[in-house]
From Swiss-Prot:
Induction: Expression is controlled by light and by a circadian clock. Transcripts accumulate progressively during the day and fade out during the night, however, mRNA stability is enhanced during the night. Low levels during the day, accumulates during the night (at protein level). Rapidly degraded upon illumination (at protein level); this degradation coincides with the release of the LFNR from the thylakoid membrane. Residues 58-125 are annotated as: 2 X 15 AA approximate repeats. The keyword Chloroplast applies. It is found in: Plastid, Chloroplast thylakoid membrane; Plastid, Chloroplast envelope; Plastid, Chloroplast stroma. Sequence repeats lie at residues 58-72, 111-125. It comes from the Eukaryota. Pfam families: Lir1. The keyword Disulfide bond applies. InterPro entries: Lir1 (IPR009856). Thylakoid-determinant subunit of high molecular weight LFNRs-containing protein complexes. This is Light-regulated protein, chloroplastic. Disruption phenotype: Retarded growth. Reduced photosynthetic electron transfer. Marked decrease in the accumulation of LFNR1 and LFNR2-containing thylakoid protein complexes. Keywords: Chloroplast, Disulfide bond, Membrane, Plastid, Repeat, Thylakoid, Transit peptide. It comes from Oryza sativa subsp. japonica (Rice).
Amino acid sequence: MQTAASSVVGLSAVLPAAVKGRSLQIQAPRRVALRVRAAAAAVAVEAAEVDYSSNISVFPMEACDLIGGEACNVQMYPEAKLSSSAAVAVSRAAAEEVDRDYLSYDEPTTVFPEEACDDLGGEFCKAT
């Protein structure tokens, strides 16, 4: 197989030599055509995009269980669940009222004084 491959490229491993007074003749390399089955030459190409629209979970631990191989080469942690006391604290924080000052935007030329001073300078800085 190696000599066939080298002749396809056009390289010859052995050059003819002069034998018993004959002159040295260099022959042109022979080209041998090899037929390769298309199925054997095909290379598997992975898609550059991943479709996440399936009903199957893509969590690493489950992927490792289902697929194995490279899917198991990630750092995995056990599933974390919030305790009931943490869930109550989160809901309390969300319900907490915050006192805010709102500006009225009903005028056609509402301007923030600090931003006007920073952007425009001059007479706009006197208003602050």
